[in-house]
Design a protein with these regions (language model features):
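C-terminal motif of bacterial Sec signal peptides marking the signal peptidase cleavage site
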Residues: 18-21
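Conserved HGGG/HGGXW glycine-rich cap/lid loop of the alpha/beta-hydrolase fold
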Residues: 59-115
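Conserved loop-alpha-helix segment in the C-terminal half of the alpha/beta-hydrolase fold
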Residues: 275-317
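Catalytic active-site module of serine/aspartate enzymes centered on a nucleophile-bearing elbow/loop
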Residues: 310-350
């Protein structure tokens, strides 16, 4: 009897080891498939320079594919305007292990892409057409194409979706309101009043003189505003990818589109408003807001209800860069949304 029990126990152990080995093999196979090359010829690590046709000539933009999934491909649109893809590098710690492919992309005038140094090209409608050309070049379509726009990238993503939602599988609007006037009002009525009165007075004095290049302006903003509402860490502890990206900011592009002040929009985007147009969107949409953001989280929750198939992710501990200061909430929700849409859900419950 003891021999039979021992033999049965050995069978159970052997079976467990066999299943574990199968799971490891399956995991390795999935990982191998995710990172395998889909290109022929010379290998470039997933980098592709894409020619962009404009009224001013043809320029090249830089893209880099990370991973390989024929059904889930997320194109990342950086903020600024004028920053680079580099602050998205934290995505490498979360999306690959879930089998989600993502694509870095420096918009024209940013990072590794061409910089025409022509302010007439810093135009929202032109950038929408640029994204469409990138989509075509990368063979993205409604079967696999998710676009994630963060901050200014969210503006670009919304305008792209309004015109080209037929090409999208999913839309992610991260930390961006749908109305520039509403954002400016929130900055004036809420954000500025959270500053110490003497700090705000000095900032306003510099802005009144249009002395934005004065080092004192950033000395005031960094600890009192940026570390509270952009990324909630002491500035000296900000992640290297964020610092690297912001150090390469195209100031011409930023000021032309956003304006020089951090409290509202005064550039070309000053009157931009898509709140009503969101009602036209039926593509599954995730809106991400954060408690300490420069953007009004209540407004962003409303955005998720304006679209026909919207989900809202609230980052309780996050700010404008909530992919860093509330990472677990941000990426858990993002991954659940992308996978849910891939499984056929129109409105993903988070």
């Amino acid at each position: 009897m003891k021999k039979i029990k021992s033999f049965s126990l050995l069978l159970v152990i052997a079976g467990g080891l066999f299943l574990a080995a199968c799971n490891q093999t399956g995991s390795k196979k999935t990982q191998s498939s995710y990172f395998e090359s889909v290109d022929s010829g010379l290998q470039t690590g997933g980098i592709k320079m894409i020619p962009i046709k404009t009224a001013k000539g043809t320029f090249k933009v830089w893209t880099k594919r990370f991973g390989n999934n024929p059904k889930m491909k997320v194109l990342l649109l950086n903020g600024g305007p004028g920053a680079t893809h580099e602050y998205f590098e934290c995505f490498e710690n979360f999306l690959p292990k879930e089998g989600i492919e993502f694509i870095y992309y420096d918009q024209l005038g940013c990072g590794n892409s061409d910089n025409p140094q022509d302010t007439t090209m810093w135009d929202l409608a032109r950038y929408v057409e640029e994204v469409e050309q990138v989509r075509v070049a990368l063979n993205l379509n409604a079967d696999n194409f998710y676009v994630l726009g963060h901050s200014w990238g969210g503006i670009l993503a919304m305008d792209y979706a309004v015109k080209y939602q037929k090409n999208l599988k999913g839309l992610i609007i991260s930390n961006m309101m749908a109305s520039a006037p509403d954002y400016s009002k929130y900055a004036a009525d809420v954000l500025s009043k959270q500053l110490k009165p003497d700090v705000l007075a000095e900032i306003r004095a510099l802005e009144a003189k249009k002395d934005f290049a004065n080092p004192r302006y950033m000395e005031l903003l960094m600890p009192n505003f940026y570390a509270e509402h952009i990324l909630r860490l002491p500035v000296e502890n900000w992640p290297e990818p964020v610092n690297r990206s912001f150090a390469k900011m195209n100031q011409s592009l930023y000021v032309t589109m956003q304006g020089p002040s951090e409290f509202g929009l005064s550039g070309k985007l000053e009157k931009w408003d898509r709140m009503e147009d969101l009602k036209k969107l039926s593509v599954p949409t995730l809106v991400i807001g954060a408690k300490h953001d420069t953007m009004d989280p209540a407004h962003m929750e409303k955005m998720s209800k304006q679209v026909k198939n919207g989900s809202y992710l609230f980052c309780e501990n996050g700010s404008h860069m909530s992919m860093y200061d509330d990472q677990q909430t941000y990426f858990t929700g993002l991954i659940k949304f992308v996978k849910g849409v891939n499984e056929g859900q129109k409105k993903v419950k988070l």
